[in-house]
């Protein structure tokens, strides 16, 4: 089967290639991801949930115990394991793009950035404030702004950028599904290299 043959179902044309959803906390990765997985006949995994299960504690507890560096090391190990599997839609943690080595695994799949404006992110995060250690403390809006400034250029290296606001998760999922065929490569085409 040829991955660019439009007569084949999209899930088959992907040939098990994983989809990695990247974007800021609150961008909708864990909401859109299961819809994509269902449409493609894939399995959905939330990387933060896998990390929590592996560590035996919550993400805030990992940050408190091991700091951000310890969390990023565990996140890297989980990504390395997940990249060995196939037919997954993975909602990654918002900071996964900040570790250059992670791009090697991410580039083995299709990287999709769910982009949300800063004001909308703040609104969403205020509505659901739990478990966000990087926003803890004084001035969460200032912290969010700083994280966005650092991460947006990294998110911009994704294969696909999708605005994830102003419509429901099912509409966002459908737009991603419509754009995926344009990202499929013919056999023998050069692979995208890590940044």
Curated annotation (Swiss-Prot):
Residues engaged in binding substrate: 48, 72, 94, 151
Binding site for ATP: 26-31, 132
Pathway recorded for this protein: Metabolic intermediate biosynthesis; chorismate biosynthesis; chorismate from D-erythrose 4-phosphate and phosphoenolpyruvate: step 5/7
Cofactor remark from the record: Binds 1 Mg(2+) ion per subunit.
UniProt record, GO biological process: amino acid biosynthetic process; aromatic amino acid family biosynthetic process; chorismate biosynthetic process
Key word Magnesium present: yes
SUPFAM superfamilies tied to this protein: P-loop containing nucleoside triphosphate hydrolases (SSF52540)
EC number: 2.7.1.71
Spans through the membrane: none
Residues annotated to bind Mg(2+): 30
Single GO term (MF): magnesium ion binding
Keywords tagged on the record: Amino-acid biosynthesis, Aromatic amino acid biosynthesis, ATP-binding, Cytoplasm, Kinase, Magnesium, Metal-binding, Nucleotide-binding, Transferase
EC top class named in words: transferase
Cofactor section: Mg(2+)
Cellular component annotations (GO), alphabetically ordered: cytosol
Similarity comment: family membership: Belongs to the shikimate kinase family.
Protein name according to UniProt: Shikimate kinase
Gene: aroK
């Amino acid at each position: 089967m040829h991955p660019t043959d439009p007569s084949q179902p999209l899930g088959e044309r992907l040939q098990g290639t994983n989809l990695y959803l990247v974007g800021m906390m609150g961008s909708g990765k864990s909401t859109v991801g299961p819809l994509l997985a269902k449409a493609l006949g894939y399995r959905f995994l939330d990387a933060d949930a896998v990390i929590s299960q592996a560590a035996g504690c919550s993400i805030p507890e990992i940050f408190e115990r091991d700091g951000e560096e310890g969390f990023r090391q565990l996140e890297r190990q989980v990504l390395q394991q997940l990249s060995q599997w196939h037919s997954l839609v993975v909602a990654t943690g918002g900071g996964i793009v900040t570790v250059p080595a992670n791009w090697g695994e991410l580039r083995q799949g299709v990287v999709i950035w769910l982009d949300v404006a800063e004001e909308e992110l703040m609104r969403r995060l205020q509505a659901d404030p739990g478990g966000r250690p990087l926003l803890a403390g004084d001035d969460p809006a200032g912290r969010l702004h700083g994280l966005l400034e650092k991460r947006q250029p990294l998110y911009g290296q994704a294969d696909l950028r999708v605005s994830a606001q102003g419509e429901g998760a099912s509409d966002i999922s459908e737009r991603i599904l419509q754009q995926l065929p344009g990202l499929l490569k013919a056999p023998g085409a050069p692979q995208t290299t890590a940044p």
